[in-house]
UniProtKB/Swiss-Prot annotation:
This is Minor capsid protein L2. Highly phosphorylated. Belongs to the papillomaviridae L2 protein family. The gene is L2. GO terms for cellular component: host cell; host cell endosome; host cell Golgi apparatus; host cell nucleus; viral capsid. It comes from Human papillomavirus 56. Keywords: Capsid protein, Cytoplasmic inwards viral transport, Disulfide bond, DNA-binding, Host endosome, Host Golgi apparatus, Host nucleus, Host-virus interaction, Late protein, Microtubular inwards viral transport, Phosphoprotein, Viral penetration into host nucleus, Virion, Virus entry into host cell. One of its GO terms (molecular function) is DNA binding. A motif (Nuclear localization signal) lies at residues 1-12, 445-453. It comes from the Viruses. Pfam families: Late_protein_L2 (PF00513). Interacts with major capsid protein L1. Interacts with E2; this interaction inhibits E2 transcriptional activity but not the DNA replication function E2. Interacts with host GADD45GIP1. Interacts with host HSPA8; this interaction is required for L2 nuclear translocation. Interacts with host importins KPNB2 and KPNB3. Forms a complex with importin alpha2-beta1 heterodimers via interaction with the importin alpha2 adapter. Interacts with host DYNLT1; this interaction is essential for virus intracellular transport during entry. Minor protein of the capsid that localizes along the inner surface of the virion, within the central cavities beneath the L1 pentamers. Plays a role in capsid stabilization through interaction with the major capsid protein L1. Once the virion enters the host cell, L2 escorts the genomic DNA into the nucleus by promoting escape from the endosomal compartments and traffic through the host Golgi network. GO terms for biological process: microtubule-dependent intracellular transport of viral material towards nucleus; symbiont entry into host cell; viral penetration into host nucleus. The lineage of its organism: Viruses, Monodnaviria, Shotokuvirae, Cossaviricota, Papovaviricetes. Signal peptide: none annotated.
Length: 464
């Protein structure tokens, strides 16, 4: 096995050591010689430079210039450089003749600047004359404008883009803005009413929220998952598990024994109940319903194995106690509120509105109960205030017929031009009670408005 070697820390450089130890005088000799260039290599270079000079050759400079003349290719001659002196303008030299004066004037006469005319001389000694004047008229300017006609015109343009909608112009003087209304009371009758306002103040610190906090929606609390495969299921039959669970694990503790909290125990070798062997914790109880019963559950943890470091390893056990079963819901027999005799299944109104749920009975209808007839009844009645008209029926079923008031339609005049009466025909109610007829399902099931439909009788059946 290769031993692990510690990482080697980098030593400080000579420059860093020289900066820290030079002031205290504790620098090693090799560090001082290297920084101050006192090594043997530095001394040999210093002594050799006293006898040799390579300054013009550019050796060791690193510039690559090749000295003053530069590099020359092998087998060729260097080019000749001719220095050209720049041309300068000639200086004019005036010759001095024998007859010229030897004194040179510094200022020529042409360079004298004339300052202009001379100062005039004033004559007389009388002095100046002072003239004073006095006026009694005040210096007031007449600013009254001339008589003229002035026309003043103004134009008011309302732009809806620059009008604040919340602002309402009240018919009174004052200042109106989007947030503040400063007004003064005026006399007269207006279309508004002044209502005294009251301040609804709440005593508080001033940091209360200005809006209500919405109550979050109903959140379903997840039920404890006590029936997983990781938990060992143990059924307890001792009732002491409900109020005194500690008596099943260890000896009683007269000082404290919580019934709705988690309990912790020290590992012991012997337990009063063998199902609670090596239990070190019992969690708080939970009531659940499973398979038609109320169940009292606690989750426990065992300490079967303990390591040298003190870590406890064990299974998790679900202890449950069935309190009582949930009885099934009792079935109650329902009784009808109305008797079976009050039935209107055989009553129909062919002219009534089909949308009506239950048509009423007419006072002029003639009802024939089926209990007094040996055959199926079929009764036809018409509501009218005039004569009776009897319509014969077929003798297929020998249906008895009772005459009653019939319908007499009003007739128009025989003279020309014919003017119909208003209304020409009135709406009549016809009630048919019995079971020996059939209504056409097209008109019976369709929800339509009130409408007159033709009808006729054939062999005792009514078809509409």
């Amino acid at each position: 096995m290769v031993a692990h070697r510690a990482t080697r820390r980098k030593r400080a450089s000579a420059t860093q050591l020289y900066k820290t130890c030079k002031l205290s005088g504790t620098c090693p000799e090799d560090v001082v010689n290297k920084i101050e260039q006192k090594t043997w290599a530095d001394k040999i270079l210093q002594w050799g430079s006293l006898f040799t000079y390579f300054g013009g050759l550019g050796i060791g400079t690193g510039t690559g210039s090749g000295g003053r003349a530069g590099y020359v290719p092998l087998g060729s001659r260097p080019s000749t450089i001719v220095d050209v002196t720049p041309a300068r303008p000639p200086i004019v030299v005036e010759s001095v003749g024998p007859t010229d004066p030897s004194i040179v004037t510094l200022v020529e006469e042409s360079s004298v600047i004339e300052s202009g005319a001379g100062i005039p001389n004033f004559t007389g000694s009388g002095g100046f004359e002072i003239t004073s004047s006095s006026t009694t008229t005040p210096a007031v300017l007449d600013i009254t404008p001339t008589s003229s006609t002035v026309h003043v015109s103004s134009t008011h343009i309302t732009n809806p883009l620059f009008i604040d909608p919340p602002v309402i112009e009240a018919p009174q003087t004052g200042e109106v803005s989007g947030n503040i209304l400063i007004s003064t009371p005026t006399s007269g009758i207006h279309s508004y009413e002044e209502i005294p306002m009251q301040t609804f103040a709440v005593h508080g610190s001033g940091t209360e929220p200005i809006s209500s906090t919405p109550i979050p929606g109903f959140r379903r609390i997840a039920a404890p998952r006590l029936y997983r495969k990781a938990f060992q299921q143990v059924k307890v039959t001792d009732p002491a598990f409900l109020d005194r669970p500690a008596t099943l694990v260890s000896a009683d503790n007269p000082l404290f024994e919580g019934t709705d909290t988690s309990l912790a125990f020290s590992p012991s070798g012997v337990a009063p109940d063998p199902d609670f062997m090596n239990i070190v914790a019992l969690h708080r109880p939970a009531f659940t319903t499973r398979r038609g019963g109320v169940r009292f559950s606690r989750l426990g943890r065992k300490a079967t194995i303990q390591t040298r470091r003190g870590t406890q390893i064990g299974a998790r056990v679900h202890y449950y106690y069935d309190i009582s079963p949930i009885a099934q819901a009792e079935e109650i027999e329902m009784q009808p509120l109305l008797s079976a005799n009050n039935s209107f299944d055989g009553l129909y109104d062919i002219y009534a509105n089909i949308d009506d749920e239950a048509p009423g009975l007419s006072s002029q209808s003639v009802a024939t109960p089926s209990a007094h007839l040996p055959i199926k009844p079929s009764t036809l009645s018409f509501a009218s205030n005039t004569t009776n008209v009897t319509a014969p029926l077929g003798n297929v079923w020998e249906t008895p017929f009772y005459s009653g008031p019939d319908i007499v339609l009003p007739t128009g005049p025989s003279t020309w031009p014919f003017v119909p009466q208003s209304p020409y025909d009135v709406t009549h109610d016809v009630y048919i009670q019995g079971s020996s007829f059939a209504l056409w399902p097209v008109y019976f099931f369709r929800r339509r408005r009130r409408k007159r439909i033709p009808y006729f009788f054939a062999d005792g059946d009514v078809a509409a």
